[in-house]
Amino acid sequence: TARTDSSFGIGATYVTTAGDSTVTIGAGFADSTTNTSGTQLVSDAGGMHIGVTAVTGDLTIGVGYADGDTFTDDGAAVADANTQVDGTVVKAGVKYVSGDITLNIGAVSGEAKDSTTTGTAGTTDDAWDEVNASVSYAVASGVSAVLGYTTVDVQDEGASDTSGGSAWYVGATMSF
């Protein structure tokens, strides 16, 4: 079992205009101290993030970066012992609206090293790389048709994992 002894978080957002664009910058930091029964972890959970978005008319562009560490307790079995995870992620996206049509493209790239030897960073990377693109068309008020594509590449302990792949999708979104 785990108990959080203390935690804190702080963040800030700044919004400004630059010509015809509205720019938003946000950042934050959080940390916590946790005690566990059994093996005491020496690396507590914490992290930071920063992101920027810019909106110019019908075009929105955003990018963000996060870095942090945490631990998980996946159970009592030896294979599920306490695991320390140190990781980073970068996300970026672009959206363009033209009348009833919206185009979206986004990318995510995350990397982490995990270790069951708490306090010691892992030596091989787990990774998740994803790209998504979609086109939606406003069919009626509150109803949009969507056509999209996504591709995901996953690595576990430095080797390709079969949970990744690519797919086309067709759907609808509704808002009331």
Where are these regions (language model features)?
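Outer-membrane beta-barrel proteins
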Residues: 1-176
